[in-house]
């Protein structure tokens, strides 16, 4: 297991109360040895005007996952902030739920890079993101 902080899924989800994460319906669903996973509904909260998943919602899911994964890689007195997010959208999603899977690409002392892949309910890749974070403290 790569994580330096050990929180339960309930504790991770509790951090989302009264935030954009909760408003979008994002829920952490799995914390593996080297991955963090969350789901987000595709509904009126996350649609763009044409009834499809908004690219910004996919980006918010990705940044949520990467930032929390980055936080889990810090020690007491440290935190992380996102410095760059890149998203490539591959496929439209009109309804259902999407699942984001976050894994590390680089874990340095002062910077981290995370790959977040968003899948539809059929397991098809919808979006590929990369989040860079800076470790503070």
Swiss-Prot record:
Its EC number is 3.1.2.-. One of its GO terms (cellular component) is cytosol. It is found in: Cytoplasm. One of its GO terms (molecular function) is 1,4-dihydroxy-2-naphthoyl-CoA thioesterase activity. The active site is at residue 63. Required for optimal enterobactin synthesis. Acts as a proofreading enzyme that prevents EntB misacylation by hydrolyzing the thioester bound existing between EntB and wrongly charged molecules. Belongs to the thioesterase PaaI family. This is Proofreading thioesterase EntH.
């Amino acid at each position: 297991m790569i994580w330096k902080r050990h929180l339960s899924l309930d504790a991770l989800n509790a951090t989302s109360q009264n935030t954009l994460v909760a408003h979008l319906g994002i829920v952490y669903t799995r914390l593996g040895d080297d991955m963090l996973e969350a789901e987000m509904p595709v509904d009126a909260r996350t649609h763009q005007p044409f009834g499809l998943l908004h690219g910004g919602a996919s980006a918010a899911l990705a940044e949520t996952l990467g930032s929390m994964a980055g936080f889990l890689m810090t020690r007491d007195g440290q935190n992380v902030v996102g410095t760059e997010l890149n998203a490539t959208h591959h496929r439209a999603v009109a309804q259902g739920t999407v699942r984001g899977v976050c894994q590390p690409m680089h874990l340095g002392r002062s910077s981290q890079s995370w790959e977040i892949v968003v899948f539809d309910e059929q397991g098809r890749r919808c979006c590929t993101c990369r989040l860079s974070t800076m470790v503070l403290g």
